[in-house]
């Protein structure tokens, strides 16, 4: 039986102070190698908090978090997971710290212990794979929103993660950048959990779907455009519409 990269077992998560009601309760989740999970739900239901809990940035109030079967309890226990699980934040600017694209993308490999030459080669290779060849000398703050998002993804992928956590990756992207990101993720074998309100995007890049209902994580299925007859709340005459 294939061992999950990470798993959560009966996890409850709450914001401080301690008496606060849980944001999520009795969460059971595992991510297998090569698995692509799409996570959706209304704003404020705890999706981002769940990703932060996986990486130890928000600690569970109860339950067990495992990485390759090992229970994570102390801060130092999460180090190996954070090196192996890449987290792409909603706002790309939160992950871009250096003047040039090359410096940003090479930062992760350098932290993993690669030499400057190896980190540069890894960064250039990753930029090329994402269609960003020639970007290495560009100033990060002058990039478009879509370009910044791709560079932040490149910075994570340059670390060769076992899994990705993507928080609203299409947020603020124009149609061209969204399509480019969709094409990249659709062919990327790396295991991942993707949060998105963009249904079309989520169904193209995910193979399993989950949502959050009443503070609990549930398996779900994607919605598709359809037509049906029903009584409209502003009138009793049945009518047809396209979603």
Language-model features: locations:
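The feature captures the beta-strand-to-loop junction immediately N-terminal to the Walker
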Residues: 40-42
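Helix-to-loop junction immediately C-terminal to a conserved catalytic motif
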Residues: 55
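Conserved ABC transporter NBD signature motif
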Residues: 63-74, 81
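Conserved ABC ATPase "signature" region
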Residues: 117-135
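Conserved ABC ATPase signature
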Residues: 139-143, 147
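Catalytic Walker B motif of ABC-type/P-loop ATPase nucleotide-binding domains
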Residues: 164-168
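H-loop/switch region of ABC-family ATPase nucleotide-binding domains
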Residues: 196-197
């Amino acid at each position: 039986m294939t061992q999950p990269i990470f798993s959560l077992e009966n996890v409850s998560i709450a914001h401080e102070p301690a008496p606060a009601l849980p944001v999520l309760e009795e969460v059971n989740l595992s991510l297998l190698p090569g698995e692509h999970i799409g996570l959706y739900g209304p704003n404020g239901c705890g999706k981002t908090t769940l990703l932060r809990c996986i990486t130890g940035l928000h600690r569970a109030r109860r339950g067990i978090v495992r990485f390759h079967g090992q229970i994570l309890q102390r801060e130092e226990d999460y180090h190996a997971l954070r090196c192996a699980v890449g987290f792409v934040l909603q706002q790309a600017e939160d992950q871009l710290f250096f003047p040039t694209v090359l410096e940003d993308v090479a930062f992760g490999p350098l932290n993993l212990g690669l030499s400057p030459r190896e980190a540069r080669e890894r960064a250039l290779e990753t930029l090329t794979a994402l269609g960003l060849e020639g970007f290495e000398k560009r100033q990060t703050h002058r990039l478009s929103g879509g370009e910044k998002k791709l560079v932040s993804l490149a910075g994570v992928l340059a670390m060769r993660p076992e899994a990705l956590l993507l928080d609203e990756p299409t947020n603020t992207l124009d149609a061209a950048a969204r399509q480019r990101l969709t094409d990249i993720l659709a062919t990327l074998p790396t295991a991942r959990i993707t949060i998105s309100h963009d249904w079309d995007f989520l169904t193209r890049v995910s193979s399993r779907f989950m949502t959050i209902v009443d503070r609990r994580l549930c398996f779900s299925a994607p919605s598709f455009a359809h037509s049906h007859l029903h009584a409209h709340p502003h009138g009793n005459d049945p009518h047809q519409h396209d979603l």
